Regions:
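N-terminal leader/targeting and accessory segments in enzymes
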Residues: 1-94
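Phosphate-binding loop of NTP-binding sites
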Residues: 8, 89-196
Length: 196
């Protein structure tokens, strides 16, 4: 459960109404069942997540992080809460880092060229599983997936088993700053295979 005060701490300004003071989840996908969720619209070269706010609301989102220079659609109810930021991805990462610090679990970071997901699942089982052990869902192990993993931790979490992947130089450094692992497991490191 993410409290609104934590989201406010990463925002430049807010559009708040009387309403919920916490979010059951954080999502970047407007198609997900998002009952009482905080929606974070991300943008890429070929898409703009801000265009899917109405869909996120239909899926149950009750608030959104919103980029300052994006116009708010007129169809959005005035009661819908918005947290204005310069960069939604950076805000997502910062929010995850702050939430990780607040929950303060013992974090086990797992990386390597292969075997990360299997190792993560084994460590999760060895530590006793839910509800006190949290793990990366599937292989959400990048600059978006790791923040979502951290933000989905229950407050009573004692251990977090976080998978960290890399597809460019410096990515593990960023993910380590977010997750702040207490223990690191490196499965193996292989040279990337290049095709011609």
């Amino acid at each position: 459960m993410i409290e609104a005060r934590l989201v406010e701490s990463v925002a430049n300004r807010t559009r708040l109404q009387d309403g919920p003071v916490s979010f059951h989840s954080v999502t970047t996908d407007s198609r997900n069942d998002s009952k009482t969720a905080l929606f974070v619209p991300l943008s890429g070269e070929r898409f703009n997540g801000h265009h899917y706010l109405e869909s996120a609301i239909e899926s149950g989102a009750i608030a959104a992080i919103w980029q300052e220079n994006e116009p708010v659609p007129m169809s959005i109810p005035a009661s819908f809460q918005l947290y204005f930021v310069d960069d939604p991805l950076h805000a997502l990462q910062e929010l995850a880092q702050r939430y990780r610090d607040e929950v303060n679990p013992y974090v086990i970071g797992i990386t390597g060229s292969n075997g990360k997901t299997t190792t993560k699942d084994i460590v999760f089982q060895l530590l006793g599983g839910e509800p006190f052990v949290h793990r990366t869902a599937g292989n959400l192990n990048n600059h978006i997936g790791v923040p979502l993993t951290l933000l989905s931790m229950p407050k009573e979490c004692k251990f977090a088993v976080v998978e960290m992947g890399m597809n460019h130089a410096g990515e593990i450094s960023l993910l380590s700053k977010l997750a702040k692992p207490d223990l690191a497991i490196v499965t193996n490191i292989a040279k990337p295979i290049s095709s011609t």
